[in-house]
Amino acid sequence: MKALLLEDVRKISIQEYPEPPKKDDHIITKVNAVGICGSDLHYFSEGGIGSANVGSGFVPGHEFSAILMESIPEMNLEEGEHVAVDPAKPCFKCQWCKKGYENLCPYVEFIGAPPFNGAMAQYVSIKKHQIHKIPKHFSPETAVLLETLGVALHAVDLS
């Protein structure tokens, strides 16, 4: 598959990259659209954010929509459906996750944040709980914006 790789500060390229391996608790998705977040710009222009430094060969991108490469019967999702993806993979074991505050998980793995490669690739492996069905009239580009919309709505809720 092809992927966009950050090779160094201000240096990117599109290269052949290994397809994600199939894992029991993951679904392979075909990336449909990817947004460019401010964090992606920091990774490109500065090589990281704080202690989150990207190395050579990092694939950015956490705001994305995808096409399912297989059905998920328990979620009533069919192969080929367009979905939105939550880039956060909380542990579901810590005190915060057990209380329902997965957003506070100190062990969260975040697609597209070092050291976890992102969605600027043709395929991404994600856990089922990260997949969200979207209305058929949503374009792939609209679905990309759902992650940022969620952040904004959460900020409004807290205000």
What are these regions (language model features)?
Residues 26, 42, 63, 144, ...:
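Active-site phosphate/pyrophosphate-handling residues
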Residues 91-159:
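NAD(P)H dinucleotide-binding glycine-rich loop of Rossmann-like/cofactor-binding domains
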Residues 5-22, 38-71, 84, 105-117:
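N-terminal glycine-rich cofactor-binding segment
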Residues 20-34, 49-95, 130, 135-137:
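Glycine-rich beta-strand-centered segment in the early N-terminal region that forms part
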Residues 13, 23, 79, 119-120, ...:
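A generic structural signal for well-ordered coil/turn residues at beta-strand boundaries
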Residues 34-35, 149:
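Proline-glycine-enriched beta-turn/loop adjacent to the NAD(P) cofactor-binding site
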Residues 1-2:
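Extreme N-terminal starter segment of soluble prokaryotic enzymes
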